[in-house]
């Protein structure tokens, strides 16, 4: 377990040597896939939590907005809020998560393929598909920082976390591909 902590800390510190160590072991490919899939599922749940909290906030503060809008717009806004709440309360949510997971897995596979093609054709780097997959998977570890979203109701903090972890994940990917 201590070794796993060291790996995670090195990734957060943008240590590009850790990616070389991880990519040299082909057995890390399955771990990278698991990190990627669970990270995207975690991000999806965090985004849904953010949307649900935003709807609750909007519903509670609709009175502040109503005074400046025409009645037809207010009715449309109330209908939209109810429709979104029905999606969260229905069985459609599980289907949405499954389709999100499948789509994110396919987009990740395509992204790894594009990165591999760019590295081998454009940058003329000697690499293989699994190494790029390992780097891509492990660079998604910062996504797990979105877990804070489940414990806070602050909309600005949730926005900051979602955007911040997305940017930090891209920075980690760039550090790993260096």
Question: Language-model segments: what does each one mean?
Answer:
Residues 1-127:
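Selected alpha-helical membrane-embedding segments in polytopic membrane proteins
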Residues 112-178:
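Hydrophobic alpha-helical transmembrane segments and adjacent short intramembrane/lumenal linkers
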